[in-house]
Amino acid sequence: MNNGGPTEMYYQQHMQSAGQPQQPQTVTSGPMSHYPPAQPPLLQPGQPYSHGAPSPYQYGYANGMASPSGGPVPSNLPSNQPVLPLPGVGGQGAMPAHYSFDTTGQHPPPGMKPRVTATLWEDEGSLCFQVEARGICVARREDNHMINGTKLLNVAGMTRGRRDGILKSEKVRHVVKIGPMHLKGVWIPYERALDFANKEKITELLYPLFVHNIGALLYHPTNQTRTSQVMAAAERRKQDQGQMRTPPAGLPSIQHQPHNSMALPGPQSSLPSNNMARPPLDRAATFPTPPTTASSVMPNMGSTDNFNWQGQSMNGNQGTNAIAIDANLGHARSMPTTPATTPPGSMQPYGSAQSFDGSRQQMYNAPSQQSPYPASNGAHDRMYGQGNSYAKNDMGPPSSRPSGSAPSGEHEHKGSNGILPSEHGHQSHAGEEDGEHEQHDAEYTHDSGAYDSNRPSYNYTAPGVGSLAGDANNVDPSMTGSPNHPPASGRATPRTAAQPQPYYHNSGYGASPRVQQAPGFYNGVGGDRPAVNGGSGSDVYAPPADMANPMPNGYAPAPQVPNGVSGVKRGREGDDDLSRPVGDVPGMDMKRRKTLESSMPAPPFDSMSGRTAPTIGGDPRQR
């Protein structure tokens, strides 16, 4: 390894000397001190960045002229000179070839002045050197010396397909798709870019690009002051970006100080405290973010006052307590606890007050939400004498529930007709059953007031059913099609008592032509039927005064009604009625409501003088 080191140094100096004898090498190494560390990339791509020689090269870029890095190199050269000729004898055979085309990139063509610009690539956090050739800007990074291969091959005039194929075959490449146009493309290592430039013979066009210490070209005497300012600004900005990125990682105070001491140890030693001092003060206005940086500085700095002030603004005592806890905890752990503890602490008093208020608002808002529905149906409500119930609903739960017992009887009675016709339509609304209705309705209203408010919306349909429900008790169960359901059981079987069906009987089927045909059928099949009913087939249009006679007569033909209905069906639905005995009607009622609806007009046929209304009352029972 001792021999390997001198040989590398020898090659570096030999390349810099441009073929000069070895003894003048020591002379040229002084003025060329910034070159020696830069040479290894050309000769041995893998080693130069791993060995000690290139590290001064990097420091040389950071500090400018690399005076400290150049110092140790000449000091090593005189001590190693006796060793240099030995490896040089064997190595000089191979070196001139590499060295020959390396000079093309290192030395300017005759009459050409270097034109290099530098820009700070904020996305990558690196300084880029740019060289323009044939109207194309080719950039080279300062940190890893990669070159934009896409722009490089564009300078060569290569087609897009060939260029992309070459760049895709590169093992080491960095694709950039976001950023300035001259920085987009595929970035390749310095050595590969130099090979491509030599093959395409564009190295001279890109002269300053491949100079190892390209940063030194920026320090031209006519341009030195400004370029030094630009480089210093770039370094400061790079450090600021590094410090702004690292704090969220966990322990910024531990990370920044070594970082600064490594990058620029001398003057930057005081920066860590300053850099950490600024972000918390600047960002203290927003509550969640300051703990990320200020938590590490919190015990040492006065920024805790800011946090205490914020905590007090939200909730005085709890905010200060949270900060005290943060000061005692570790810096990394105090960061999340600050926003986690103070906001809940500040929210607790409001939460406790609002939770109770919110519950009361919900209690009072429930009737208010119920009230819109009654309000929309207010006309119907007043028609049926339920205006008082809505006043009680608007009052609030405590007032409506206790007072709803006595007057709500009306409301609940109507509600049973309105929203619960399927439940109570089967039953007669006599005194005892009405009392039961009121009791059950009271249970519903106390349990769910929201449903109670919706009930009146259906009340406009109830009275017709309710007024006729008393007559439904006079109809035989077999006649209604639901013999298995007694009047009391209808409360638990709403499906068999669907509400919409009676409406169709009222409008469509109460006085339909089928009703007219029923007497004809009775006259044709059994002549005694009209006599039993107390009139002929034309009794369908008999005045209501005859209702007293047919009312008692309706009980006799009731069991025979389904057979008669089959005739009313005109034979089209006769098969259904023949296949459906009276005992099967309840089961069939679940599946064939329409057929039952059409079969229900049979009671009018028995009483046809004017008993269409009782059939309506009977229909809810069979439902």
From Swiss-Prot:
Gene Ontology CC: nucleus
InterPro entries in UniProt: EFG1/Phd1/StuA, HTH_APSES_sf, KilA/APSES_HTH, Tscrpt_reg_HTH_APSES-type
Location of region: Disordered: 13-111, 232-270, 332-623
Skewed-composition ranges (Basic and acidic residues): 423-446, 570-579
DNA-binding stretch(es), residue numbering of this chain: 149-170
Main localization, broad class: nucleus
Annotated GO biological process: conidium formation; positive regulation of transcription by RNA polymerase II; sporulation resulting in formation of a cellular spore
Free-text function comment from the UniProt entry: Transcription factor that regulates asexual reproduction. Binds the StuA-response elements (StRE) with the consensus sequence 5'-(A/T)CGCG(T/A)N(A/C)-3' at the promoters of target genes. Controls conidiation by positively regulating the expression of brlA and abaA. Positively regulates the cephalosporin biosynthesis gene cluster. Also involved hyphal fragmentation and cell wall integrity.
Protein name: Cell pattern formation-associated protein stuA
Organism: Hapsidospora chrysogenum (strain ATCC 11550 / CBS 779.69 / DSM 880 / IAM 14645 / JCM 23072 / IMI 49137)
